Structures are given as structure tokens and as C-alpha cells.
């Protein structure tokens, strides 16, 4: 058998290498082979970290399934703090076939990574529900209660009825048993997936609002009170999507 080329090693190491191939790569003195081997080791280490984290994040769901539960929904929200735009919630039901290792708290992911994961979550999840509370509801109810209403809406919009909810530090007003978790999006894959879905949906809405209401930099700040947003408020006044109960919106003129 002819000696493997450096290109051969690079190709084979990138595709589930056998133990014998790894041993051959480790023993090969050529610089190019050693570089390819070290790259494989770094990638394997990263993959192992992802697998470990994923298994930790699936622990609550797997425990629920092991005790006879069928559908557990993770719920999260995005947009409680901004001065403008809705609060968006998502409820996501997974099963034991779910294997997106990169799913994590949406705040730990780039916009590009969230956008890439979103369709895969929608494809692999058993069910996904969305809830939205607009600025008017937020002003009428307060942000906490509006978020709870939106979470209940997300649960109702699921195509299956969950028998357990995993919620990030809130109580959802639905007659379903709930487990409240502090920083749940870092502890549950279902909540992490919900945080990604809610974030992508809300960012898309705010990007659309940026076209409707130019001058506030919504596509960049997503409604949060950045310097450009506050400058827009001062010069243009508040829009219909601004939360009138939030300072400094309260004293701004209306568009």
C-alpha cells in the first residue's frame, strides 16, 4: 500500500478517523501530518466539551422522560428591558432524538449562529410555540405580567400539550406543573432552544420596525436605550411601538 500523502491524512482525519489512522498520524514525522493531527485533537476536544455541556443541559428533560413524562416544554423570553418593541416568548418541546450540540443560551451565541440554529431547532423540535406582548399590553399590565401573558400564549400555541414546563425564573399562568429555574437557559436545552427562537423572532421584528420608524437605530439596538436610540427619541419623539410606561419614553413627544 503506497504511503499516505499529507492530503490523505487531512481528508481522513476530518471524517471520523479510525484508531489505526490516529496512531499512524501521531507517528508520522512529516510537519504537515503533525499539523493535521494537532488540528484534529483540538477539534475533538471542542466536540467533547460540547457533548458534555449538551448532556448536562438535557439532564432535566431526560429525568422527566425517565419518570414517564412525554412532553416537557422549555420557555424563555426576550425583550423585557428595551424601551421599544414587544416582549417575545417561545415554548419548545424536545425529545430524546434532539442532538443540536451547539444549542446554548442565546446571549452566548452570535446573531449568525442563532440564525443558523433557528431552522434546525424548528425541524428537530417536537413543537414550538411563540407568544408576543406588544408595547400597549406592556403599558397596560406592566412588563412582568405582560411577559407572563406572552408565555401562556406560547404554551397555548404549541401543537402538543406539555405535562411539565421548565421556566426561566417565572411562573406561567397555565394549569400545568412547572419547574422554575434560575438562569434556566444555561441549565436546560429546551429553555436554551426557546431563548434562541424568541431572540431570532424578536430581532427580525425590530429589524422590520427599523424600516417603518427610521431614526432610532432599531436594527442595531433592538429597542434598547442606546445613545442613538435616545437621540432619536429626543429629536423625533416616541413611536407607537415605544413603551410609554418606561422612562425616558414617558416624557418624549409622540410621532
UniProtKB/Swiss-Prot annotation:
Residues 70-255 form the RNase H type-2 domain. Keywords: Cytoplasm, Endonuclease, Hydrolase, Manganese, Metal-binding, Nuclease. GO terms for cellular component: cytoplasm; ribonuclease H2 complex. It is an enzyme of class 3 (hydrolase). The keyword Metal-binding applies. Its EC number is 3.1.26.4. One of its GO terms (molecular function) is RNA-DNA hybrid ribonuclease activity. A divalent metal cation binds at residues 76-77, 168. Manganese or magnesium. Binds 1 divalent metal ion per monomer in the absence of substrate. May bind a second metal ion after substrate binding. Endonuclease that specifically degrades the RNA of RNA-DNA hybrids. Belongs to the RNase HII family. This is Ribonuclease HII.
